[in-house]
Curated annotation (Swiss-Prot):
Residues at which [2Fe-2S] cluster binds: C33, C39, C42, C77
Keyword Transport tagged: yes
Domain 2Fe-2S ferredoxin-type: 1-95
Cofactor binding annotation: Binds 1 [2Fe-2S] cluster per subunit.
Location in or out of the cell: Chlorosome
Protein's name according to its UniProt entry: Chlorosome protein J
GO biological process: photosynthesis
Organism: Chlorobaculum tepidum (strain ATCC 49652 / DSM 12025 / NBRC 103806 / TLS) (Chlorobium tepidum)
Lineage: Bacteria, Pseudomonadati, Chlorobiota, Chlorobiia, Chlorobiales
GO cellular component labels: chlorosome
Length: 225
């Protein structure tokens, strides 16, 4: 069967963990703690196919708030494919990337509020869950440290690859970068123009709505005697 991680088609089968599917298909899902369910770097949003996945367990409930569950939030290292169907997931990093590149200010505010709510309300239960698992023998600290160490190298490479994919102009010649940077400034100014009702623009930008370079807030004349 084919599932989609950040819109990338990935081969999978019933019984697979979402995290393992991502690894095998070189899709972007973080895995710093090696699948021990403590770092939350494998957090994903299930956009479609929640009924094809296992029910959230206690480890997930300890870290994920009701708000994030309502948005389809899951930990990929704790989520198993239980039946065939259409499954689409979006990683937290990819969702944030799309919000930033799309200059979605309201979306960013909502995103930040939800994440802040989750940290504030679930941090105590998350820590309690880790302590409980260590005490019961379900979590081996030595093994966990080893998994973190082995996962840092591929994880850092994955971050680099996805950064270059998200911002390809970083590999371009300087003259090309300047053009891309100007375009980014114009886009940001356009968003500011829309939000402010046309009253504000970024200095040096070109607003498509007004079709003229934005003026600096204040002009300063410097003369030498």
């Amino acid at each position: 069967m084919i599932i989609y991680i950040n819109d990338k088609p990935c081969n999978a089968k019933v019984g697979d963990l979402l995290l393992n599917t991502a690894k095998l298909n070189k899709a972007h899902i973080g895995y710093i703690c090696g699948g021990n369910g403590i770092c939350q770097s494998c957090f994903v949003y299930v956009l479609e196919g929640a009924e094809c996945l296992s029910e959230p367990g206690e480890d997930e409930k300890a870290f994920i708030s009701d708000k994030l569950f309502a948005e389809g939030g899951r930990l990929a290292c704790r989520t198993t494919i239980v039946k065939e169907g259409t499954i689409r997931v979006l990683t937290r990093a990819e969702k944030f990337r799309r919000i930033v590149l799309g200059l979605n200010v309201p979306g960013f505010i909502t995103y930040a509020q939800t994440i802040g709510y989750n940290v504030t309300n679930k941090l105590p239960s998350g820590v309690s869950s880790i302590v409980s698992r260590v005490q019961s023998g379900r979590l081996n600290p030595v093994d966990t440290i080893g998994k973190i160490a082995s996962g840092l190298s591929p994880a850092s490479q994955l971050v680099y690859n996805n950064f270059i994919e998200a911002f390809p102009f970083m590999q371009a010649p300087v003259n090309m970068v300047s053009g891309v940077a100007k375009s980014a400034i114009d886009n940001a100014s356009g968003a500011l123009c829309t939000i402010s009702g046309g009253r504000l623009h970024l200095p040096g930008s070109t607003c498509t709505a007004h079709d003229k370079p934005a003026e600096a807030i204040e002009r300063i004349t410097i003369s030498a005697k």
